[in-house]
Amino acid sequence: MLKRRFPAVAPEFNLTLRMNILDPTPVRSHVVTTDVEACDVLVIGGGPAGSTAAALLAQQGRKVVLLEKAHHPRFHIGESLLPANVALFDRLGLREQIEAIGMPKYGVEFVSPDHDHTVALEFSEAWDKSMPYAWQVRRSEMDEMLFRNATAHGADTREGWRVRNVDFDADGATVQATHDDGEKRTWRARFVIDASGRDTFLSNKFKAKQKNPKHNSSALFGHFANALRGEGKLEGNITIFWFAHGWFWYIPLADGTTSIGAVCWPHYLKSRTKPVKDFFADTIALCPQLVERLKDATLVDDAVYATGNYSYTSTHCSGERYLMLGDAFTFVDPVFSSGVYLAMHSAFESVDVVTAALERPAQAAALMQRFERYMRKGPREFSWFIFRVTNPTMREFFMYPQNPMRVKEALMSLLAGDIYGKTPIWRSLRIIKTMYWLVSAGHPRRTWLAWTRRRRNIRDLGPLVGENVVDAK
């Protein structure tokens, strides 16, 4: 049973970075501060990874500077969290605050155009039953909460500062940044953490960024009011709708709005010949089940946005005086909502590496090698399923879930983000993969057509350009 959720107040939806608050002091133009400020760690980017790392390191008594190019609250896509996030918010002391702003998310619903039923999977069905839910959140609220938490723990947090250059030497790094009022400053840091997200600051600097050869996708997205929702416990579940050119996310938020996006093949988005809002409407029309849920819905702020170049990685994520965290290192696809979890968990893992680099240099190299392996593990485990999520064989697995040899429990553990602990899911996940190959081999024509179509669809067609295009880096 679906119900309609009305927002109590008209929600704001502004993809551009929030305008600076008016300041009665005169605007400075091209002011250069000659003093060089010293710090132990300079963090680039005040999103989930950067703010978490800054808070944890400041708690240790480190002198931490956190530079965020925007001003919180600022919009960011990626509003769905995983149950594995809950423990991280506990460790940060922020669980109650997240509970207050989040919509409880107990599972995921799958809707296929080729099946006459839907499937709802709950996180309580995972191998470890102790992580039964997560939240859907407005990232503007959550990211600001994490940023202010870093401030509260002693980090020197600054907004409106864009890092322009980082020069490394044997003792650390010289970091130059510009404020959005024109002021320029220089910091001398013993260690640098790049948490710049899709700006991939250090990866670009070292020419380490690589397009993912196995995946390529683009997205259209907007927020809707008055969209239909599930009843009771099902209200906050994310829904994945497959359609001819990819899949849709459907994320109910606590204020009554619903975040909806189409993740599609680049060639489909590049075929657009009309305004992005109209193209999004045409795309939604390709999914009748989604059309039904939006029959009385209205687009918030009349705004739809597009983003391209979703998938990339980097050749490395660590160096003698730096680390790359979260999306600053790699990003694959948002289908399993893994981005925020991987970013925050990488911040927790970074603490021991930074501590060794600053205090026990002889141990740092081994810890950095371990960190490199860790940073590749999460995206690798999710990617195997992400690369195949639009394949008809994988779609059958999701639409007819079975649990022989605990394969369903293992899959739900993966979807919950339970990939770094001691939960023994790996044998069952290997069984899923074996079953996938056997079923695919049993349908050679279907498998061949799906493979050739995917190879054609993931071709690199160049950067996405046009109106309302964001993060096209």
Regions found by a protein language model. Name each.
Residues 149-290:
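Predominantly flavin-linked oxidoreductase catalytic cores and closely associated redox partners
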Residues 355-473:
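C-terminal helical "tail/cap" subdomain of flavin- and related membrane-associated enzymes
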Residues 6, 13-41, 56-60, 458-473:
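Extreme N-terminal leader/targeting segments of oxidoreductases
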Residues 76-115:
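N-terminal FAD cofactor-binding segment of flavoenzymes
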